[in-house]
Amino acid sequence: MRCPYCTGESAVIDTRELDNGETIRRRRRCKHCDRRFTTYERVESVNVMVVKKNGDREPYDREKLLRGLRVAAYKRPISADVIDTLVTEVEAALIAYDALEVPSSVIGEQVMERLRSLDEVAYIRFASVYRSFSDLGKLREAVEELMEKE
C-alpha cells in the first residue's frame, strides 16, 4: 500500500482483528519517509440507498458518517476505534432494517442512541447538526432533555 504522506511503499508492522473479526486493522510504516499510519479492511456489506429529508436518495456512505462523528467527537476522549465500532454497530442495524432504502432519520437516531451513552458533549454536537437547531432555545431543550434522562 502507498504511504498517504509521500506515496512510498509501506510495510505492515501490526495486524489486529476488530468487531468480532469483521474488520482488520493494520499499522503500517512507510519504507521511504518512516511515518506510520493505520488502514482498515472490511467487507463492504451495507448496500442501501439513504432517503434524505428532502426526498433525495444517495448511496449509504460509511466515510460520510465517520466524518460527521469525528466532527462531533473533536477534542473529546473518544478514540478512532470507538468511533469505528459505533459506525459498525449502526451498519449492523441498517442490515437488520432489511430494506433497500433507509430514511436518514433511522441512521441519525441510531447514531444518537449510541452517542448519548458514550459522550454527552459529542451527542449534543451531533444532535445540533442532525436536528438542525435553529436557535439557542432548541439547543437548551436538547440539553435539558439529556439531563432529565440521567
UniProtKB/Swiss-Prot annotation:
Cofactor(s) needed for function: Zn(2+)
One Pfam family linked to the record: Zn_ribbon_NrdR
Cystine bridges: none
Annotated family: Belongs to the NrdR family.
Function: Negatively regulates transcription of bacterial ribonucleotide reductase nrd genes and operons by binding to NrdR-boxes.
Matches recorded under NCBIfam families: transcriptional regulator NrdR (TIGR00244)
Protein name, per record: Transcriptional repressor NrdR
Organism (species): Herpetosiphon aurantiacus (strain ATCC 23779 / DSM 785 / 114-95)
